């Protein structure tokens, strides 16, 4: 299923802009939403309306203030299955820590780990 929306959660607005450009370069009609505050992103996702079956790609930074990407995933794990089934989570990080990569691979709700920067080739691999 082709994703209907790309959501980026990263406290760095410059990275969010770069993600937007890479995504729109590969998927010109992509719906894009960016959050610099992971709590607001989580509120948005957890309030997703019932009956909305659209698929969303969620690109999640690891190192953020207040909530890390791992905190976000921990709370996401507790959401209703109907909501979780609409999201494919990818950790998008500049971290070169192998523990982060391993943790992403072991998480049941994280599809993959992607190193920054997001490029149009990496976007293509998500589709």
Feature map (PLM): residue ranges:
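A Lys-centered signature of the CheY-like receiver
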Residues: 115-116
């Amino acid at each position: 299923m082709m994703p209907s929306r790309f959501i980026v959660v990263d406290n760095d607005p410059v990275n969010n802009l770069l993600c937007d450009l890479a995504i729109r370069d590969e998927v010109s009609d992509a719906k894009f939403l960016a959050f610099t505050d992971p709590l607001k992103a989580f509120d948005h996702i957890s309030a997703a309306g019932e009956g909305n079956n659209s698929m969303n790609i969620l690109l999640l930074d690891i190192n953020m203030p207040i909530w890390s990407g791992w905190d976000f995933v921990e709370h996401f794990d507790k959401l209703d299955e109907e909501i979780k089934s609409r999201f494919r989570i990818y950790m998008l990080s500049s971290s070169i820590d192998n523990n982060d990569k391993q943790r992403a691979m072991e998480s049941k709700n994280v599809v993959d780990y992607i190193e920054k920067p997001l490029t149009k080739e990496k976007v293509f691999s998500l589709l």
